[in-house]
Amino acid sequence: ITDKANENFKWIGIIKLFLPNSIILHCERDQSDICFSIFKNNFNSKNMNWSSKPEHITRYYDLYKKMMNFWKKECGDFFYNISYENLINNSENEIKNLIKICNLKWDDRCLRFYENNTTYVRTTSAVQARMPIYSKSIGNYLNFKDFIKFN
């Protein structure tokens, strides 16, 4: 099961309790890039009212980092950390590592995930999930750094 919702970090304790053999794949990304991505997507959920102002996003990001650090200390073997930037810039190697960590069999189609049009994606990145890996989101916030601050 893969779920990349912004608030999944809140459920790590429950996941560990009910799925003790599962692994949390934690993708870490530059703080300003991730905060800007949240800001520009304009989430209209009452559960994500923190996502409309840069200062609220930054505060929420700080909470997320504190919680992730706590859970990594409590159950580090339950986590696999991957750098977003490494995943983008060294995709084949990083994807092979992910497949290995999940005890799955390698298949070259893993590098062509975007060709699978039967996968249901219900997030703001549904279009991106159907595209090859690209790097234009790395440093994207730099275009707006004079107008918006996230750290």
Go through each PLM region and give its residues.
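Glycine-rich phosphate-binding loop used to anchor ATP phosphates in small-molecule kinases
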Residues: I1-K16
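Generic beta-strand/beta-sheet core signal
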Residues: D3-A5, L25-E28, I82
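Conserved nucleotide-binding/hydrolysis micro-motifs of P-loop NTPases
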Residues: N8, R29-I34, L87-N89
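Hydrophobic/aromatic-lined pockets within catalytic cores
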Residues: K10, P20, N103
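Short gly/Ser/Thr-rich phosphate-binding loop of adenylate-forming enzymes
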Residues: I12-I15, N86, E92
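Residue-identity detector for glycine
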Residues: G13, N21-S22, G76, G139
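Conserved phosphate-donor/acceptor-positioning beta-strand/loop module used by diverse small-molecule
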Residues: I15-K40, L98
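PAPS-dependent sulfotransferases, especially Golgi type II membrane carbohydrate sulfotransferases
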Residues: C35-N81, I88-N151
